[in-house]
């Protein structure tokens, strides 16, 4: 058994692990990375964010071709199979792996491929694919092993018609009708993707409103858009059992309803990847979803062991995970890079996409904050008209007395890009966070960014 000594060992090479390893390495620490896949990138690169967003991009291109009258001169609308569309995602994955492999090499991070588990509080044993066991001793260890889809024991996920958000990428045909159980972020994103391919989608939600953490107006806009695009949303429903057939699947609901489709995609929650870490050897406990509890410094109950990313739960975003990993390493190296990641933009890649940061109207009303609203509808924006993307809006919430920006919410074309302008101004200290910034700033024309000026004028016009 080979033995190696490090300052920091990171378990998992997803966004959180990468952020942790890079920050520790750049601070001069000797760092090792352990991942159970034979390529770096984690589930984010191989099964989650990257393939699903590449898939979404391809579907949007197909939708644009099929709905833009200009293209009728060269042919009728065309439909592509799911496996054919998925091929574009595979190219992006390989490019991402190559880039990230280069990051670790340039920063002299040693990468071990194999299953890592705790022998004790300062030792990780890695079982390599060839069966060789290597021992890594470390002063500090960061757990960034991510998550996987939650699988209830009473559902047969080995049935060829039943999928989760990982296995759906192996779908070898295009279903005519698909049941998506779970209307969270992942469920809504995949509902959009399959709807864009012409698939009839039944989206089953166990709550009364889609993505209830969003501003209610944005959530309602998404619901309306879904209803116009072959997506039937069934609220306040819970499954009783899933019946797999040779030619499809039947979802039995507790309300007595039954839904039949060609396939079922399970998108109801995720579980932390902690079951193979040997946490019982070091006294770290996990909750019912396999997640680790950490403090504001991302430290677990064992002082030299930290956690970051999906494995610690909220907010379970790749963007936040990277910052959490970087901050966990910052707590170790004490180079001023630590911060508690709590106010991050939400990016939801439905079609159209959604993004937001800060407070929503429900929260401000409940807190009795005197706020006002400014809106810009994309149907009136020149850039949106040029792009043929008239659906959507930008919504700014601001304090009616100080003009401080309290929240930014966007639904539509380039929403995940647009939100960062508002984020930058909201992060300015004191009186520099002010709605008038958007009135006094010159925006390129035509751009989607100038929606901020339109929304700012709309908000100021509401004051009296």
From Swiss-Prot:
Its EC number is 1.6.1.1. Its main location: cytoplasm. FAD binds at residues 35-44. Binds 1 FAD per subunit. The keyword NAD applies. GO terms for cellular component: cytosol. Belongs to the class-I pyridine nucleotide-disulfide oxidoreductase family. This is Soluble pyridine nucleotide transhydrogenase. The lineage of its organism: Bacteria, Pseudomonadati, Pseudomonadota, Gammaproteobacteria, Pseudomonadales.
């Amino acid at each position: 058994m080979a033995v190696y000594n490090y300052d920091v060992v990171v378990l998992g090479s997803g966004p959180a692990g990468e952020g942790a390893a890079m920050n520790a390495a750049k601070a001069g620490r000797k760092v090792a990375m352990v991942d159970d896949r034979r390529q770096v990138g984690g589930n984010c690169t191989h099964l989650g964010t990257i393939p699903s967003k590449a898939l979404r991009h391809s579907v949007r291109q197909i939708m644009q071709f099929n709905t833009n009258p200009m293209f009728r001169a060269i042919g009728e609308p065309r439909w592509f199979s799911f496996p054919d569309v998925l091929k574009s995602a595979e190219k992006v994955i390989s490019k991402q792996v190559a880039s990230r492999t280069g990051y670790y090499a340039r920063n002299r991070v040693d990468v071990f491929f194999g299953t890592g588990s705790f022998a004790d509080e300062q030792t990780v044993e890695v079982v390599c694919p060839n069966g060789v066991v290597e021992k890594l001793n470390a002063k500090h260890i960061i757990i960034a092993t991510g998550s996987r889809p939650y699988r209830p024991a009473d559902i047969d996920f080995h049935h060829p018609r039943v999928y989760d958000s990982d296995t759906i990428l192996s779908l070898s045909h295009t279903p005519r009708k698909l049941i998506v159980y779970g209307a969270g972020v992942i469920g809504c994103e995949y509902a959009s993707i399959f709807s864009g391919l012409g698939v009839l989608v039944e989206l089953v939600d166990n709550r009364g409103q889609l993505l209830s953490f969003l501003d209610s107006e944005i959530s309602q806009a998404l619901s309306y858009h879904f209803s116009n695009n072959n997506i039937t949303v069934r609220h306040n429903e819970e499954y009783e059992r899933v019946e797999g057939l040779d030619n499809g699947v039947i979802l039995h609901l507790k309300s007595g309803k039954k839904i039949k489709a060609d396939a079922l995609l399970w998108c109801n929650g995720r579980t932390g990847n902690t079951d193979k870490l040997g946490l019982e050897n070091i006294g770290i406990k996990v909750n019912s979803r396999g997640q680790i509890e950490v403090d504001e410094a991302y430290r677990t109950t064992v002082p030299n062991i930290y956690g970051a990313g999906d494995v610690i739960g909220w907010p379970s975003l790749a963007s936040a995970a990277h910052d959490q990993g970087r901050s966990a390493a910052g707590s170790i190296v004490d180079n001023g890079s630590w911060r508690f990641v709590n106010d991050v933009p939400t990016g939801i890649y439905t079609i159209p996409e959604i993004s937001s940061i800060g407070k929503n109207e429900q929260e401000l009303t409940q807190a009795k904050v005197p706020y006002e609203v400014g809106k810009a509808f994309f149907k009136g924006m020149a850039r949106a008209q040029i792009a043929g993307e008239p659906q959507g809006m930008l919504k700014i919430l601001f304090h009616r007395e100080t003009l401080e920006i309290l929240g930014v919410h966007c639904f539509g074309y380039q929403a995940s890009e647009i939100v960062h302008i508002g984020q930058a101004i909201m992060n300015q200290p004191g009186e520099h966070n002010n709605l008038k910034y958007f009135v006094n700033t010159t925006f390129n024309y035509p751009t989607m960014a100038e929606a901020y000026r339109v929304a700012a004028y709309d908000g100021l016009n509401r004051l009296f």
